[in-house]
UniProtKB/Swiss-Prot annotation:
The chain crosses the membrane at residues 102-122, 169-189, 201-221, 256-272. Mostly expressed in flowers (e.g. sepals, petals and stamen), seeds, leaves and cotyledons. Belongs to the peptidase M48 family. M48D subfamily. Its EC number is 3.4.24.-. It is found in: Plastid, Chloroplast, Plastoglobule; Plastid, Chloroplast membrane. One of its GO terms (cellular component) is plastoglobule. GO terms for biological process: leaf senescence; proteolysis; regulation of leaf senescence. It is an enzyme of class 3 (hydrolase). This is Plastoglobule-localized metallopeptidase 48, chloroplastic. It is a multi-pass membrane protein. Zn(2+) binds at residues 191, 195, 240. PANTHER family: CAAX PRENYL PROTEASE 1. It comes from Arabidopsis thaliana (Mouse-ear cress). Residues 1-47 form a transit peptide.
Amino acid sequence: MAVSVSAPVLSLCYNQSGELSRSLGYRLPKKVGFSSGRRSVSYIGFGAEKVGRFRVRVPICRAVPPLLFKDLDADDFRHPFDKQNTLLLRAIPGLNEFGKALLGSMTEQIMLLENIGTSVLVSKNQLSDLHGLLVEAAEILNIEAPDLYVRQSPVPNAYTLAISGKKPFIVVHTSLIELLTSAELQAVLAHELGHLKCDHGVWLTFANILTLGAYTVPAFGQMIARTLEEQLLRWLRSAELTCDRAALLVAQDPKVVVSVLMKLAGGCPSIADQLNVDAFLEQARSYDKASSSPLGWYIRNAQTSQLSHPLPVLRAREIDEWSRSLEYKSLLKRANRKSTVQKV
């Protein structure tokens, strides 16, 4: 990813709240979730099999090769709210220059060492199954695969860091890997790749600093007006919808992505096999109905206006609707079937 400013890009996905990172002063989210969904094909990488109280992951392979989007452009799947809000942000005078002044090489180096120094680099010779999931997801989205690190943490999370002049990388926590099936984990990686594919760049950095709220610059909160903060949060929510679409392009099954959001809302490994995607989609429709009245609309707006991510039920409804759209079906028609099936 080519970032236009010398600034870190931190993508903290699938979260509503966070805990403080001591060394950086950033808040990292407490939860991230993808849950299993029914698929017509199996997945490269890890399958999940329950043995007693434990989930044992076993290598599996796709029964059908995935579709590849060789000529895929970011605007082919970018959410219209993402397009609209990005244009509004670009129209704010001096914001890009402010980013250069605020986020310098010191911040870059701290974040780089914080992530790399405490993690395991994934490669063909290190966690090769996970490496295969990333490489395939990047191939499907027509993007160069970034580096991938696994970090020991009890907090399920995944995020992306892109630093000007350096190769971007994704970090996943060990607890997230334990929580997910291979399909879900690859969808998480695809979501993170979506941020790189769409060059979300400095806007994502600003939004994360504002929403995570712990960047140690004196009087930072007073330097940005509330209207700008609201605009950045609105953009960040729309960017997440875009990256959910990237997850669908890789999963190629909407139930995989919807079940991700269901687990985010209220799932854990011990009850994963009892979760019902169709019931969760019905719940999303009931939320729309409940918030359709004037009072419901006001409550819904108050509930979501300060969030960095859309509500899980709204994301589920959005991705379900897009999976049935002409736009998505047109992309599938343009895609080519991968010629071979890999086993990892």
